[in-house]
């Protein structure tokens, strides 16, 4: 699966997968993006990464594909699902996401995604399997996001089962000249970090990520 949180582009995938809502007519949208560092669920994928995606939504059903440069080939994601939003403001969704790779960067991840949202709060839970180059592993992931009307957001995420680690992400997104801009600070646990201390052991990591994207 690789771990994706590429602000303008990666967050578009996460939000579409977790908080889809019903619409009266079919809609197709496209997106392109660039991030100074590509993070997914607290894990660094690549420094300086470009991405592009396409999404379809009709009457609560959504489907799409998203691809990003991961250095050794491409990450290509496919996802679909169904979401509803009730008069009370509560939203719920269920979907599937597959993460595939054209090179040797990683092996396939496949997962089922569940989402709940109400007001400024959204809760996501995913359960999946990593092919592991012949040694498959099961994992799950839980995240809680709080989004403000001003564009500020905060997310805490927790890996479980055969994966381990947690992270905190706080960011701000805004539009400028028809582009989606973003900045985020990420703190991840030593299990997810790519940083090491003077002793050579993994340490907690920190990163500031800038992004720009365009949707139409």
What are these regions (language model features)?
Residues 2-8, 15, 20-216:
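Outer-membrane beta-barrel proteins
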């Amino acid at each position: 699966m690789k771990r994706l949180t590429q602000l303008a582009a990666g967050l578009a995938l996460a939000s579409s997968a977790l908080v889809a809502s019903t619409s009266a007519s079919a809609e197709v949208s496209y997106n392109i993006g660039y991030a100074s560092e590509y993070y997914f669920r607290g894990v660094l994928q690549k420094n300086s990464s470009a991405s592009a995606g396409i999404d379809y939504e009709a009457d609560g059903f959504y489907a799409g594909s998203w691809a990003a440069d991961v250095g050794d080939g491409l990450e290509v994601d496919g996802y679909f699902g169904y979401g509803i939003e009730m008069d009370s403001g509560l939203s719920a969704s269920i979907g599937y996401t597959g993460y595939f790779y054209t090179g040797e960067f990683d092996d396939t991840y496949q997962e089922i995604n569940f989402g709940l949202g109400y007001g400024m709060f959204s809760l996501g839970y995913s359960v999946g399997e990593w092919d592991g180059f012949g040694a498959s592993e099961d994992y799950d992931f839980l995240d809680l996001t709080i989004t403000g009307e001003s564009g500020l957001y905060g997310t805490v995420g927790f890996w479980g089962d055969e994966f381990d680690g947690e992270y905190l992400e706080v960011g701000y997104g805004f539009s400028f000249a028809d582009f989606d801009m973003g900045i985020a600070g990420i703190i991840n646990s030593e299990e997810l970090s790519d940083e090491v201390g003077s002793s050579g052991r993994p340490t907690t990591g920190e990163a500031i990520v800038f992004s720009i994207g365009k949707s139409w």
